[in-house]
């Protein structure tokens, strides 16, 4: 029971940080919006890049963090908005988490 309280508290603390991160990066916002549109399905890097009209390198940076441009602590995975699913032959599929769906839904209102 204590873990449920701690999880809810951490999600509430995380929410403003997530919203700030999405507002600071157009690419992160486009990726989250695209994954929201195709939810509950996921997508792979190059497909996300194609639909967001950016490069796969930018997608990887926004999702995982890369160098100074995309800080790891502000990455979509680190913020628990996106989760990584591995499928078969080294295929990485990214999908929006339930927290990510809640936040994108609230931002669209």
What are these regions (language model features)?
Residues 4-32:
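Short alpha-helical segments that sit at the start of domains
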Residues 53-75, 80, 88-91:
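Short amphipathic alpha-helical interaction segments
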Residues 91-109:
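Short, amphipathic alpha-helical interaction segments positioned at domain boundaries
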């Amino acid at each position: 029971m204590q873990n449920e309280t701690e999880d809810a508290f951490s999600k509430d603390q995380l929410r403003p940080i997530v919203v700030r991160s999405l507002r600071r990066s157009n690419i992160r916002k486009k990726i989250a919006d695209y994954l929201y549109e195709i939810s509950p399905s996921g997508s792979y890097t190059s497909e996300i890049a194609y639909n967001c009209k950016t490069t796969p390198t930018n997608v990887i940076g926004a999702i995982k963090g890369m160098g100074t441009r995309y800080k790891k602590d502000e990455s979509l995975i680190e913020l628990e908005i996106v989760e990584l699913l591995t499928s078969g032959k080294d295929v990485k599929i990214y999908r929006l988490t339930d927290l990510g769906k809640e936040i994108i839904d609230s931002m669209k209102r």
